[in-house]
Amino acid sequence: MEEKKGLGLGRLVSIATGTVIGAGIVSLLGVAMLFTGASGWLAYSAAVIVGLIVISPYIILCSTMRINGGNYSYVSAVLGDFWGGIYGLCFTMVGLAMGLFGMSLGTYVKLIFPSIDVRIFAMCIVTFFFVLNLFGVNLMAKVENVLFYLLMIGLLSYVVMGFAKMTPETITVGQPDFFAGGAKGFLSAVVLLMFSTTGQSYVVAFSREARNPKRDIPLAILITTGVILVLYTLVGFVTCNILPASEVAGQNLAVVAREIMPGWMYYLFLIGGPIAAIFTTMNSSFVIFSRPLETMVKDGFFPATLGKTNKWGVPYFLITFIYIIGMLPLIFNFSMGAIVDDSILIESIAEVLAIVAVLRFPEKIEGAWENRYFKFSKGFFRFVVILALLTRIALIINTCTTLTPAIIVVTVVSVLIFALYNYFRIKGNHVHVNKSYELQ
């Protein structure tokens, strides 16, 4: 059976797709329309393309080796234990976004059950997926596979019903509210929407369980990118061309769904579309965010006790730590905007380190370049990685211009704390980075 041999391409695609299609498509499109009006769908297409540029180094890297500890494995191998530790801690803190996923899910469930408390429900659903992930990757992958098909049916029904309802009069291309915020507004929308266009690269965390990681991980990322380019563009086009942009901006997909679907189908869409989308992302997030920590424990950044596993091979202390991180925004009632802003900035800092490591790995990891599955040239490799690095830096600069000083200060202080922790842990001779990748 497949679980004995490892995860095949099909399951990796469903995991990657389920991870990337989540709170973003169902919650952020309306926010993006506040910046750019009815051109929100075009901003989504651009965000997917820019996102592919940013994650392209990982596609190349994954074709050369099995990465057992997520991106942390090669960052520490190439840049050293200090920078590897900073990457791992920064990446793990993106787990704060699970609070966003829970709140987004709660807003949709409230449309079906108006009496629920959104924040309490969000806490319950994060807890549910925490417990589910304690039973191992195989169960998680099976659940993800089912949710994937439910998600596709839900979003495609939204697209089909939307195009059936659309008329030439409702199409806004060329109208005053198209590019409503000008070039700056459009760019701000692209940067915001990128929060939901790069998550397919997180499938790297499942390299250890993949049957043929050097081929299937890159293909899963590319296939998923193609899927979301088409799906996000279509969903966005429907969302921006049924009702006036002023009625949809700042709202979620339910506003348009209620307009284009009969009552019974509207409720089925809520379950198969937005709710399934957020379910798939939350389901895979525990493994994705805990995988670097698992390897960091083995390398000595944290006490060995934290790496203990249960009978399903799950590091339950680390999964619990990720659970606590995800619950913090819910317990302290952080705003969704603050969660997104902080997550984007912390992730961007971590990804700069990861891209620099990719650029240097052919010289630092002996035999890796010769071992690549896809035989691209070094010139092409350098062009792609440098373009990704420059794009990521430009995005950080643009993001900082739109963030509040408080978010920037909190992020910088967090990174400094991570750096100090790593410094004293290494100085105390606790850290001994082990090889956590395999050349096959």
Regions found by a protein language model. Give the residues of each.
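Membrane-interface "cap" regions at the ends of multi-pass membrane proteins
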Residues: M1-S39, G51-S56, N68, V173, ...
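Helix-loop-helix connectors at the membrane interface of multi-pass transporters/channels
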Residues: E2, Y74-V78, G102-A122, G154, ...
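Helix-loop-helix junctions that connect adjacent transmembrane segments
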Residues: E2-E3, D117, N145-Y267
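Transmembrane alpha-helical segments of multi-pass small-molecule transport proteins
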Residues: R11-V13, S45-A46, Y87, I112-L139, ...
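Hydrophobic transmembrane alpha-helices that form the core helical bundles
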Residues: V31-F35, A43, I53-L134, L139, ...
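TM-loop-TM module centered on a large, flexible mid-protein loop between adjacent transmembrane helices
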Residues: S73-V75, G80, L111-F113, L222-N283, ...
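Membrane-interface loop-to-helix entry segments
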Residues: V118-P168, A180-G181, T198, I221-G226, ...
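A generic transmembrane alpha-helix motif of multi-pass inner-membrane proteins
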Residues: L345-E347, S377-Q440
